[in-house]
Amino acid sequence: MTESTFPQYPRLVLSKGREKSLLRRHPWVFSGAVSRLEGKANLGETIDIVDHQGKWLARGAWSPASQIRARVWTFDKAESIDIAFFTRRLRQAQQWRDWLAKKDGLDSYRLIAGESDGLPGVTIDRFGHFLVLQLLSAGAEYQRAALISALQTCYPDCAIYDRSDVAVRKKEGMALTQGPVTGELPPALLPIEEHGMKLLVDIQGGHKTGYYLDQRDSRLATRRYVENQRVLNCFSYTGGFAVSALMGGCRQVVSVDTSQDALDIARQNVELNQLDLSKAEFVRDDVFKLLRAYRERGEKFDVIIMDPPKFVENKSQLMGACRGYKDINMLAIQLLNPGGILLTFSCSGLMTSDLFQKIIADAAIDAGRDVQFIEQFRQAADHPVIATYPEGLYLKGFACRVM
C-alpha cells in the first residue's frame, strides 16, 4: 500500500513528554497523556497516535470515555487495520498454540490473550471446534466484523460463540452481548480434555468463556501434594481442582462454592472420570463463613486450595482486597494440619506477586503459624505475557508448607 492509497486516520496528539511509554511499546495511552484529537473519530475507530511535534508513534483505537483513551493495534506505520491485519495476528498466535497443543495433548486453550497477542481487548478461547469470543474494548467491538471474517478464514470448520457479556464493556459505553455468531450452538455441557481429565464446560452460561483455562498447569501441579490427604477446595467452580486431586490419590476432597449449578457440574465431572464419588463432598456455602465454622468445629485438612474470584477491579479497591486476601488465607492456614499445604492464588491484575507473598506472610503471622514458600505458579503458557506489557501477568499463586 502506497502513501497515497493508505487510509488517513484521525490523529491523537500527546502532550509534551508523554510519549515515553509508547516508545517502550506499551499498548495503552491514558487520558492524562492526551493533548487533543485532530479530526473526528467514533467510539473504537482507528486513529494515529503522534507526539506533540507530530511524529508518528503508533496506530490504535479511540475510546473517549475511558481512562485508557487509546489501545495500540500496531507500532508499524505501514500496517493498516483490516481483515488481513487480524488474519496475520491470528496465525501468529496459532503457531504457539499448535506447539503447546501437540506437546500437552490439548483440545482447548486460549487462542488470543489480548494485548500480549497484539489484539488489545480481544479474548478468544478454543474449546474443541468452538471459538468463544470476548470483545472487551471499544476498538475490539468496532473491528468485530473484520475479526470475525479473519476467524472464518483461519478456522473455517469452527463455530463462533460470543460471550461479550462482561461488565467492563460498560466502562467504554458498550452494551453486553452474547449468542451464536457462526455455526452451531454449543451444547449445554461440552466435554474437553486436560492432562488426562475429562471436564464439562458450560460455554453459554458459565463464568467468563465457560472455564478457567489459565489454571491448567496449577491443577496438574496439585496432584503431587494430595496423595492420601484430606483436601479442601475453596471457590471450586466446576471442580477442575477436585478432579485433579482425586486423580492424584487424595483421601477426600471437599469442594465449596456458592453456585449449586457449578457444584452439580463438578459432581458430573467426577463421575465422567469414573472416580470414587464417595471421596468427593460438595458444599454450597460462602467460603468465608464456612472456614470460620470449620475453625469453630475444629475441622482440619492436609491440603487447602484457595482460588477466589478477582477481589479488586481498580486501585481504589486494592487496600480492601488486601484485607480480604489476608483474612481468607489466615483462616486457611489455621485449618491446616502441621506440615499441611496451602495452594493459594490471586487473579487480580493489580495484585503483584511480591504484594501477594507479603499478604500470605502477614496472614501466617496473624494465624500464629510459620509458613515456607515451596513453589510459585502463574497462568498457563497459552496465556503469554508480552515483555512490554507486564500487566498481562495477572494470575499468581504459591504453594506454602504450613508448620
From Swiss-Prot:
Which cell locations does it reside in? Cytoplasm
Please state what the protein is called. Answer: Ribosomal RNA large subunit methyltransferase I
EC number(s) for this protein?
2.1.1.191
The entry's function note states:
Specifically methylates the cytosine at position 1962 (m5C1962) of 23S rRNA.
The cellular component terms of Gene Ontology attached to this UniProt record, alphabetical and capped at eight, are: cytoplasm
Q: Hey, which family's this protein in? A: Belongs to the methyltransferase superfamily. RlmI family.
PROSITE patterns this protein is in? PUA
NCBIfam families from the UniProt entry:
PRK15128.1
Organism the protein comes from: Salmonella newport (strain SL254)
Reactions that this protein is recorded to catalyse: cytidine(1962) in 23S rRNA + S-adenosyl-L-methionine = 5-methylcytidine(1962) in 23S rRNA + S-adenosyl-L-homocysteine + H(+)
Which class of enzymes does this protein belong to? Answer: transferase
Keyword Cytoplasm among record annotations: yes
InterPro entries referenced in this protein's UniProt entry, alphabetically:
PUA, PUA-like_sf, PUA_sf, RLMI, RlmI-like_PUA, SAM-dep_methyl-trfase, SAM-dependent_MTases_sf
Instruction: Using the record's annotation, list all stretches that form the PUA domain.
Output: 9-88
GO MF: RNA binding; rRNA (cytosine) methyltransferase activity
